[in-house]
Amino acid sequence: MAKDIYFNEDARKSLLSGVEKLSNAVKVTLGPKGRNVLIDKKFGSPTVTKDGVSVAREIELENPFENMGAQLLKEVAIKTNDVAGDGTTTATVLAYAIAREGLKNVSSGINPIGIKKGIDHAVNLAAEKIRQSAKKITTKEEIAQVASISANNDSYIGEKIAEAMDKVGKDGVITVEESKTFDTTISYVEGMQFDRGYLSPYFSTNKENMSVSFDDAFILIYEKKISSIKELLPVLEKVLGTNKPLLIIAEDIEGDALAALVLNSVRGALKVCAIKSPGFGDRRKAMLEDIAVLTGGVLISEELGITLETVEIEQLGQAKTIKVDKDNTTIINTGNKEQIKERSELIKKQIEDSTSEYDKEKLQERLAKLVGGVAVINVGAVTEVELKEKKHRVEDALSATRAAVEEGVVPGGGSTLIEVAMYLDTIDTSKLSYEEKQGFEIVKRSLEEPMRQIISNAGFEGSIYIHQIKTEKKGLGFDASSFKWVNMIESGIIDPAKVTRSALQNAASIAGLLLTTECAITDIKEEKNTSGGGGYPMDPGMGMM
């Protein structure tokens, strides 16, 4: 296919035009007085959102060169959202400001490579300053404040997230689901829960709801399939002597082994239940080892030289409570706290080392099941449109709150970026080249843009307030919702440090790419044939008489 090629100024101008269009659509959502954006859907009612990344995801421009610029900026929003869960609009505003100021300098003949070096130098210093300025959050009230701001100043959502996090701990899993009612509620699952139910309904101890409930039970954790009851007899006899229930977890239990267990359960000779191992492949073995640590047992594996026939009662796991239904198993643990802590640290290390988002998510789930259980926030709303929008806000707020717990918080409302700009003013740049100094200055000016936009969305002129904040004492900022000068931290106007830092770093990364672009290539659109087309070809001899 033939290509269309733009060079130099033409390429950069077209890309910047696309960046500007996406930035203008996203920036109206910034701050407490940010406006809604209405997004048309081909089917059903339009989506209403105040979430920057949702707006960015929807934008595709007709001009292919402008669209390339817009897609680059979209990457800033999506990356910031993935890393920190919030700050997408701030990142978009910063990226456009740095790109716009940078391209002015490039147009006047300044070397873009030098400008980019200066930008990177300033951003590295700024990111370190944000890290140092962060205040650790520990209380439920502080967590609720962060979550409320990330949920577009919805204090009810903030309180629910703080409540969930308080219950399951910072390593616990919190999932968000759609409620079947109008109310937003939280449900908790203590201990370890996994999606494996009983292999036969005849194991049920409660015939009304067809579930199994054991107290003070033994757990046999076996790596392979069990087909013969002969293998199981020695361990069954040992458990029978203790008069305690037994849960068997194995890759599968089939044939006469399953039949004999069901028969013993129905007759009341032995309280027993059998389930399949959770997970698949390598993850299955890891999860069985987790269960062994959680219950103080041993994974029965031939690799370790243990067979079913030689299992001792001390090698079985123990649980305070076990609940099994047709879909799920829940084990409330009695394991050694020290061993559980060691296992948790090992999983945390694997999370840090993993490069796959999917693997990280699965490891995080395993960690939560070991240390804190699972909380489910069931989001309710009156209409389908409101439900989708609300669920999205809760998910964003949850990610941002995790970021706040991880790296701490800084004053919000764009005031931290102004303080960072003032800090950059004190840095000695005499050893930088002229081009690098220009890049350094671009970052200092661009750091004012988020606050300027927040104030503009509230209906005021940003420049006056930005000048004033530079003369006020540290920690003060402009509260755009009440139109007052306040101490940002004390007033609960805070942002996760990770959100602010990620927004700036991602913005500078993409802006630097735009500045150093010298050529843009895209496919030439083929003109569609609009002449009637269909039917049979006319015989040459059948022209008009």
Swiss-Prot record:
Any one GO MF annotation of this record: ATP binding
Catalytic activity: ATP + H2O + a folded polypeptide = ADP + phosphate + an unfolded polypeptide
Pfam families, per the entry: Cpn60_TCP1
Enzyme Commission number: 5.6.1.7
Enzyme class: isomerase
Location of this chain's protein in the cell: Cytoplasm
Keywords: ATP-binding, Chaperone, Cytoplasm, Isomerase, Nucleotide-binding
Keyword Membrane: no
Entry keyword annotation includes ATP-binding: yes
GO cellular component annotations of the record: cytoplasm
GO biological process: protein refolding
Binding positions (ATP): 29-32, 50, 86-90, 413, 495
UniProt record similarity statement: Belongs to the chaperonin (HSP60) family.
Subunit and partners: Forms a cylinder of 14 subunits composed of two heptameric rings stacked back-to-back. Interacts with the co-chaperonin GroES.
HAMAP family, sorted: CH60 (MF_00600)
Cited function: Together with its co-chaperonin GroES, plays an essential role in assisting protein folding. The GroEL-GroES system forms a nano-cage that allows encapsulation of the non-native substrate proteins and provides a physical environment optimized to promote and accelerate protein folding.
Protein name: Chaperonin GroEL
